[in-house]
Amino acid sequence: MRGREPLIAAGLTLLFHGCVLVFGSPGVLAGRLVDPDCYVRLMRIERLVTTGAWWDGLMPLLNAPQGLVMHWTRLFDLVVLAFSLPLLPFMDLHQALFWGGALTSPLLQVPAAMLIAWAGRAYVGGRGSLLAVVLFLVQPGIYGVYQVGRADHHCLLLTLAVAVLALLLTWAHRCGVARHLPLLAGIAAAAGLWVGTEALMTIAVAGGSLALGWLLGRRDAAAALWHFALGLLLASVLALLLERPPAEWTAVELDRLSLVHGVLVILLAGAAGLVALAGRNTRAGFPVRLTVAAAGALLVLVPLGLLFPQFFAGPYGEIDPANQAVFLQSVREAEPMLARGATTWAEASFALGGLLFALAFSLAQLYGL
């Protein structure tokens, strides 16, 4: 990252969370994490350290006496360990995991802020990119993800989503010169998919934007889409092999990286390859591109629907209907986008406030207003 803006963004992020620690009196200073999930996550990591059982995700104290296997994956566990292990010379494992987990979320906001400053500079200038960083820091919904004391994987999901979009925005501004950026974006998207299936939305936005760009006439977007899909495919397959033991490579779980997601990225790579081949024809007009795009969509949707029809029910589609109704009504982060549960449309609009302003600004920039 060149320029001073990313470094300033990192400083602003650390200053922001430092002020929260000094003036906000967060519970972590009293030895409390944000919610029960944070404690369960640290228990899971502690069990990994003490047993070394990488593929054993059973939590024996949950749903006793049977125990419970969470839908969580190991990548975030490794990130927390990376922040915790340097503390071991100064405290025991229990305390090191507590403070490593408590600081993981705010520390992961640092690279996210740096990426925003780096990618935004080309579009809104240095000052504008730093203003975007400030807006990123002070939004209540985003702060809730990155707050001190929240040892939760959503902070890593959001940082990886920012990485995907920042890499593709930078590629778009450089007019396709930096061909490695879509490949890196695909790898970041695969890392997000390893962390949680919420990353499917990031993949849809990123891949869909590249496909739409090619459809509307940006010819280098076809190759970029292929590189993105290739990075996504290779990294996702590697993640699947690492996350699951060989006996579970054919397991199908909608809410955790499994065979269904492996098949999905293979189909997406096939569709992207079809677009890339068509993109070599510089004379292909809009009707031809539209036909190819439709064929690519069918190449993904038809086999996926035949092999895994439950995929389209969402990550919680296989949960017992009685449990699903209670779960979706009570856990806001698990709610479907359109079928609101506990959250009202007013609350959803409030959460999207920053996006609405960004859309208005983008339209104004596009039409020179």
What are these regions (language model features)?
Residues 1-26, 36, 277-298, 366-369:
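Start-transfer (signal-anchor) and selected internal transmembrane alpha helices
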